[in-house]
Amino acid sequence: MMKELPVDRDDAPEPVIQVGLPLTSDALNTLVAAAWPGHSERDWTPILSRSLLWVSAKQQERLVGFVNVAWDGDRHAFLLDTTVHPGVQRRGVGTRLVRAAAVATRAHGVEWVHMDYEPHLEAFYRGCGFAPTRAGLLRLAAPG
């Protein structure tokens, strides 16, 4: 069951960033629903079971940030589902999540990290150390 997280106050403690913290589908669905209107609930168990790692941000026991790292089994990894609760956005939580993911991913011997690029997030990507590149994309599922 999804419930809305309260908007965090300016005097709330800084979120704690952790790699590989056990997470439930309920917690992830609650976070994603707050950050991405129109989100449909999903079972995150099979997704996380195939991940190289994930990084989470918790504030007072509430999940307020998440990034998933998938990989090709060799030198390339992919940041997916980067999400920060609106109540803590624009406070550096997303940057801290991505940087922690990069450090943890490097420890696995990965040489390159890829991320889908959205123009309106360019300042965020650059702040995390990403450079824009041209990439190809083939949609396999029908829109909708």
Regions found by a protein language model. Name each.
Residues R42-T83:
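A conserved beta-strand-loop-helix scaffold within acyl/acetyltransferase catalytic domains
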Residues R75, E111, A131:
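Short acidic/polar active-site loop segments enriched in Thr and Asp
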Residues T105-Y117:
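Conserved GNAT acetyl-CoA-binding A-motif
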Residues H114-A123, L138-P143:
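Conserved beta-strand-loop-alpha-helix junction that forms the acyl-donor binding cleft
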Residues V88, G92-A100:
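Conserved acetyl-CoA pyrophosphate-binding loop and the N-cap/start of the following alpha-helix
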